[in-house]
Amino acid sequence: MSQLQVRHDWKREEIEALFALPMNDLLFKAHSIHREVYDPNEVQISRLLSIKTGACPEDCKYCPQSARYDTGLEKERLLAMETVLTEARSAKAAGASRFCMGAAWRNPKEKDMPYLKQMVQEVKALGMETCMTLGMLSAEQANELADAGLDYYNHNLDTSPEYYGDVITTRTYQNRLDTLTHVRASGMKVCSGGIVGMGEKATDRAGLLQQLANLPQHPDSVPINMLVKVAGTPFEKLDDLDPLEFVRTIAVARILMPLSRVRLSAGRENMSDELQAMCFFAGANSIFYGCKLLTTPNPEESDDMGLFRRLGLRPEQGAVATLDDEQAVLAKAAAHQDKSTAQFYDAAAL
């Protein structure tokens, strides 16, 4: 019998009960759901590039790009178009199907919007999906980016509403939800997840996933990040999260949002191959590929491909699934179950 449910009314106690399951039971449930929708041996690959680095005015306590903390990070202006396109071509050649561009802003300036839209169009012309993360968006900005052809927009919720004030004070939780509303309304696909290991409690991890799963439409991509502790940030000396709690978070995300891509995101550089293998089994089916995620380390491409070979995994080819038609995806899952269980842009200012 199928365990797959697409719901938007999850209660906190239901989610906490999933987290409390014996590990074998939780992994079995998550993996069974994963196999109903996706090929469990395919992983979608994205490449993430920082197109504008550092000097962010926000006070996110985990972030080395905040201007409020002395992390030794050198700020950089918005990258030149050819620099971005060179990176995109390299990503495509390495097997990435999606190219994500991130800027350390509170929100994009109007004067930069024409250039950002051109960037989207140029990358799409290479035959890649496009994603951006630029901070908060107004409804008008979301529509502009959608009209330019941007496929995905990333804006993470970070943590639960209850713990959020311990992480950031310069942007409200509602600000983040409003941006996601604008992105959905524009027709772009939503990429939204969070970070674990920031000193939060287990109920906060449940609360983060509750917020994501109870959105009007589940995010198409759900990045789950393990905190990367950076010297100079307020979170640099936090205790490490039990790795098995990270696996549990991946598994519960898969159960709550069965049609979403669950991305094994930041923190993989410090994860063992065995831990990553457990995450893939638990339902993670997307990674960021390349030696750096914005400003934090990531496994070398050769290491990732070596791990894929050892696990029998392969990069996903062609177009990725979307949540545009939940009933069609559910029908497909049911059928599958029946068969088998110059570097910088001169005009930009910081």
Curated annotation (Swiss-Prot):
One of its GO terms (molecular function) is iron ion binding. It catalyses: (4R,5S)-dethiobiotin + (sulfur carrier)-SH + 2 reduced [2Fe-2S]-[ferredoxin] + 2 S-adenosyl-L-methionine = (sulfur carrier)-H + biotin + 2 5'-deoxyadenosine + 2 L-methionine + 2 oxidized [2Fe-2S]-[ferredoxin]. Pathway: Cofactor biosynthesis; biotin biosynthesis; biotin from 7,8-diaminononanoate: step 2/2. Pfam families: BATS (PF06968), Radical_SAM (PF04055). It comes from the Bacteria. Belongs to the radical SAM superfamily. Biotin synthase family. The lineage of its organism: Bacteria, Pseudomonadati, Pseudomonadota, Gammaproteobacteria, Alteromonadales. InterPro entries: Aldolase_TIM, BATS_dom, Biotin_synth/BioAB, Biotin_synthase, Elp3/MiaA/NifB-like_rSAM, rSAM. Its cofactor is [4Fe-4S] cluster; [2Fe-2S] cluster. Binds 1 [4Fe-4S] cluster. The cluster is coordinated with 3 cysteines and an exchangeable S-adenosyl-L-methionine. Its EC number is 2.8.1.6. Signal peptide: none annotated. It comes from Shewanella sp. (strain W3-18-1). Catalyzes the conversion of dethiobiotin (DTB) to biotin by the insertion of a sulfur atom into dethiobiotin via a radical-based mechanism. This is Biotin synthase. [4Fe-4S] cluster binds at residues 56, 60, 63. It is an enzyme of class 2 (transferase). [2Fe-2S] cluster binds at residues 100, 131, 191, 263. Gene3D superfamilies: Aldolase class I.
